[in-house]
Amino acid sequence: MEAFAAESGGMPQLNPEFWVSQIFWLIITFGILYVVLSKLILPKISANLENRKSQILENIEAAEKQREESEQKIEEYEKIVQSSKNEAKNYFKQAREKVLKDIGVKREILEKELDEEVNKAEIEIKTFRDNAPEKIKKIAVETSSDLLQELIGAEVNSSSISAIVEDLSRKKMDEYYGN
């Protein structure tokens, strides 16, 4: 065979006398390859692709469900937060109103007490003012009597001292009160 290939001088694959056997074996090889691919490998690949496709679709559906659930949870959370804010505002408003009401009540009580104290003080001042001249006159008469008794050494008539003090105090009262 070596001699034949060397004599013919070329590649044996391109020799036309071997083409029939080459085509035969080529058809058998590709036929077997086709059968193996179509019956064994391609169904496995196709099944694998279908599994992947179904898994992807399931994952997409699960993701959609989770997205919807998360949106629903977010809406519930926002409702809860909003209701909590409203509740807090109501509590704050009620507390504020209560405090303002308590302050108002205490202010009224305090104003009444202050008015009562002012009225008492005015009454005391008026009473003192009304009684003060009499007491001052009495003290002035006693003091003047004692002083004159010390100076003169004799008993002094208290009615004359009283008349003098009365006259002087009337003049001072007229000056003071503008009568």
From Swiss-Prot:
GO CC annotation, single: plasma membrane
Gene Ontology molecular function: proton-transporting ATP synthase activity, rotational mechanism; proton-transporting ATPase activity, rotational mechanism
Record's subcellular location: Cell inner membrane
Membrane topology recorded in Swiss-Prot or TrEMBL: Single-pass membrane protein
UniProt-listed InterPro entries: ATP_synth_b/b'su_bac/chlpt, ATP_synthase_B_chain
Sequence intervals crossing the membrane: 23-43
Keywords recorded for this protein, A-Z: ATP synthesis, Cell inner membrane, Cell membrane, CF(0), Hydrogen ion transport, Ion transport, Membrane, Transmembrane, Transmembrane helix, Transport
Its biological purpose: F(1)F(0) ATP synthase produces ATP from ADP in the presence of a proton or sodium gradient. F-type ATPases consist of two structural domains, F(1) containing the extramembraneous catalytic core and F(0) containing the membrane proton channel, linked together by a central stalk and a peripheral stalk. During catalysis, ATP synthesis in the catalytic domain of F(1) is coupled via a rotary mechanism of the central stalk subunits to proton translocation.
Subunit structure: F-type ATPases have 2 components, F(1) - the catalytic core - and F(0) - the membrane proton channel. F(1) has five subunits: alpha(3), beta(3), gamma(1), delta(1), epsilon(1). F(0) has three main subunits: a(1), b(2) and c(10-14). The alpha and beta chains form an alternating ring which encloses part of the gamma chain. F(1) is attached to F(0) by a central stalk formed by the gamma and epsilon chains, while a peripheral stalk is formed by the delta and b chains.
Family: Belongs to the ATPase B chain family.
Identification of the protein by name: ATP synthase subunit b
